[in-house]
Design a protein with these regions (language model features):
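Bacterial N-terminal signal peptides that target proteins for export
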Residues: 1-10
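Conserved N-terminal structural module of periplasmic/extracytoplasmic solute-binding proteins
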Residues: 8, 23-194, 206, 232, ...
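C-terminal motif of bacterial Sec signal peptides marking the signal peptidase cleavage site
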Residues: 18-22
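Ligand-binding "clamshell"
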Residues: 112-125, 150, 207, 314-344
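Carboxylate/His-rich catalytic cores and anion/metal-binding grooves
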Residues: 117-145, 199-203, 213-248, 302-326
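Helix-loop-helix "hinge/cap" segment bordering the ligand-binding cleft or interdomain interface
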Residues: 150, 155-228, 249-304, 358-400, ...
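Long, K/E/R/D-enriched contiguous segments that form extended
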Residues: 283, 293-339, 350, 356, ...
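Conserved small-residue motifs centered on glycine
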Residues: 384-514
């Protein structure tokens, strides 16, 4: 079925021509060899372009690790990132101009690229590249097939190699600053009421930072698709894992609507109460993502709901670089549920997001060289360069064979300038979590238990020691993977207006963006909640839930074929 998107497109041809003119060229020689790397026959480096529909930081053209990787693989990729548009708008611009980079990850805009015929089918290539072939099981590759039966993209994340090694909770949680926990002598925080009372009490006793800057007790990110920081907390408060668009009863395998639950009412009523008390940041509903990150980076924000990947590598590094960790400004997850029930937020095993991934476009003039580069990036030598860096410069190897970093190396790794000039993780290309081939080391520093703990700021170490844990994961607990349906967001993220359920999903998003801020700010909560519920029910959510249920049933049926 063809898909449709409603997209605002501006500066179409000009933008596309500016960004991606000359895609995939290597200084005049386009006859790249794909054997043992992608270097052209005359030794020149082949250059590709890539666009990722998420915000990111560009690295310097003379980046040191990128150059080392280029010398070893024969390829260098110029990466560009999303600025000033949604993913769908940016992709719509490219589609309208019919000009593309060599590589692309369009996020929620992937269906537009597929419909436009902009992507290269990968089926006939995968078997030629062993690292790519082994990246997924046969079942997982089959899950990536589109309605025409072909595979067009490779999901880049949550692929676990060997033994799982996880120290960070990369997903959604209630976060609170270490200074708040220390002030309260590291209390047990189990409920939503516990969480907000602690923030209230701390802010009443300590309304400013050391320099006199006022705290922001609690802020909410609501911009564009990131409004999950506001709207989907009820499913987590009820203890469910992150299916994103619904909850799933693991016994009956039925989808449930968290938007209308009793917990949803209690949660939004609590936010309303905290807003009236001045605890919720009044700029929450108008701030941009950049403004939100700037607030976190300043150390002023005591608590928030967010996903680790959405703030840690920006605000976390900024806090460390500014020395604000010495004031206890790092964020720690706490297992908050509505009534203290067990949470299922962190799950073992990888999560296959079949809804988007890295694709190669029709404008790539050497698909085999592009895929050889992806294959090379998954080799252990290059993967270590991407995530550990250069041995002796970015990390050391102990007598026991374990990788570790010195204090100076860790400090450098957090510096913005050093990351731009030296580090090159090719972060939106396929990658592994888990264990290296040596069976000892984690594929990334964040998974190396001793290195992870040694590299923690002192405020986090003190908190972990007080709670008797060594990782963020242990703060929350871990659970087995929920089931073959999981996660449902990999389906709902690509809903389109072609179906009744997809139209309902679009309308629900619009209603939430408009109504939920009003619910939080209203003087009369009950009246505002009724207005919101009336608008929500008018969106025909049953159609949306019905399509989710059909997809869940399909996933369970497909999984049964491989049992």
């Amino acid at each position: 079925m063809k898909r449709k998107r409603i997209v605002s497109v501006m500066l179409v041809a000009a933008m596309a021509a500016t960004l991606f003119a000359g895609c995939g060229k290597n200084g005049g020689n386009d006859n790249g060899s794909t054997q043992g790397g992608s270097a052209s026959n005359d030794g020149k480096i082949k250059e590709f372009t890539a666009f990722f529909a998420v915000p990111g930081s560009e690295i310097n053209d003379d980046n040191e690790v990128q150059q080392i990787i280029a010398e070893k693989t024969g390829v260098k990729v110029k990466e560009t990132w999303l600025t000033g548009q949604t993913a769908e708008e940016a992709v719509g611009t490219l589609v309208a101009g019919d000009e593309y980079p060599d590589f692309i990850c369009g996020g929620n805009g992937m269906p537009q690229l597929y419909d436009a015929g902009a992507l290269v089918a990968l089926d006939d290539y995968i078997d030629k590249y062993p690292n790519i072939k082994n990246y997924f099981t046969e079942q997982e590759w089959d899950q990536l097939r589109q309605d025409d039966g072909h595979i067009y993209w490779i999901p880049q994340f949550s692929n676990i190699k060997g033994e799982e090694k996880t120290c960070t909770h990369n997903d959604e949680a209630f976060w609170i600053q270490a200074r708040v926990l220390e002030w309260a002598n590291y209390p047990e925080i189990k409920t939503m009421d516990d969480y907000f009372k602690l923030i209230e009490d701390y802010n009443a006793a300590n309304p400013t930072m050391e320099d006199g800057t006022e705290n922001i007790p609690y802020t909410i990110l609501c911009e564009d698709w990131r409004y999950f920081c506001l709207e989907n907390a009820p499913q987590f408060l009820d203890g469910y894992p992150n299916d994103g668009s619904c909850m799933v009863d693991p016994d009956t395998l039925k989808v449930m609507d968290y938007n209308t639950s009793d917990t949803a009412v209690k949660y939004f009523k609590k936010l309303n109460e905290e807003y009236q008390k001045g605890i919720v940041d009044p700029e929450s509903f108008t701030q941009t993502y950049d403004e939100y990150i700037a607030k976190l980076s300043s150390g002023r924000v005591l608590g928030m709901i967010d996903q680790w990947w959405d703030f840690a590598n920006t605000a976390g590094d900024a806090i460390k670089s500014a020395g604000l960790d010495a004031q206890g400004c790092d964020y720690i997850p706490v297992p908050v549920t509505i009534d203290g029930r067990k949470n299922q937020w962190h799950n073992s095993g990888g999560v296959l997001n079949s809804g988007d991934g890295l694709a190669i476009t029709k404008d790539c003039d050497d698909v085999e060289a592009a895929l050889q580069f992806v294959d090379d990036l998954l080799s252990e030598e290059i993967h270590n360069l991407r995530f550990w860096g250069v041995e002796g410069e970015d990390y050391q190897v102990g007598d026991d064979g374990l990788f570790y970093r010195t204090k100076e190396q860790r400090a450098k790794a957090a510096e913005t300038d050093y990351k731009a000039s030296h580090a090159c993780s090719y972060s939106y290309f396929p990658q592994y979590d888990g264990t290296c081939d040596d069976g000892l080391n984690a594929t990334k520093p964040s998974g190396q238990a001793k290195e992870f703990f040694d590299g923690l700021n002192d405020d986090v170490k003190k908190a972990f020691e007080a709670y008797g844990v060594e990782t963020y994961v242990e703060m929350l607990g871990t659970n087995e993977a929920p089931g073959a349906w999981y996660p449902m967001w990999s389906f709902s993220n690509n809903f389109t207006t072609d179906t009744e359920g997809g139209m309902a999903w679009t309308k629900i998003g619009e209603v939430k963006h408009e109504q939920l801020p009003q619910v939080v700010m209203a003087k009369d909560f009950d009246k505002a909640w009724k207005t919101y519920m009336d608008a929500y029910k008018a969106c025909n959510p049953d159609a949306f839930l019905s399509e989710l249920q059909a997809e869940l049933d399909k996933r369970m049926k497909d999984a049964a074929k491989y049992e």
